[in-house]
Amino acid sequence: YYSYSAKTESLPFYDTFPMTLVVDIDPINGHFSGGNLHYLRPTARQSIAKTWGSGSISYPMRCHHKYFIGRASNIRLVPAVDLRDFVPLPSEQFVRELGGVRVEIPSSFIWSRL
């Protein structure tokens, strides 16, 4: 997981504290991509995290996102063994930038759209 600040204002919303299984890194274009658990409801999140803890790298495509490397900070690696006993905490924070002002978007709104 890490802190993230989106670069573009064209996004309808983004997660400021993603928990992502990184599956691709593109250093030439300066981005990485993977499955962000926070785009899943907590029960689905827990199930997917447990499969990651067992070595799987699959996830629903609705949680696949691309991130700019330079916009990620405070990166923390979660050992796979810790994902086996994963308990979803409400650590996601979805926001939208409107005229330079950051507005929080409820998680339930995000989950209902995906």
Where are the model-predicted features located?
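Intrinsically disordered, low-complexity, charged/polar segments
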Residues: Y39-L114
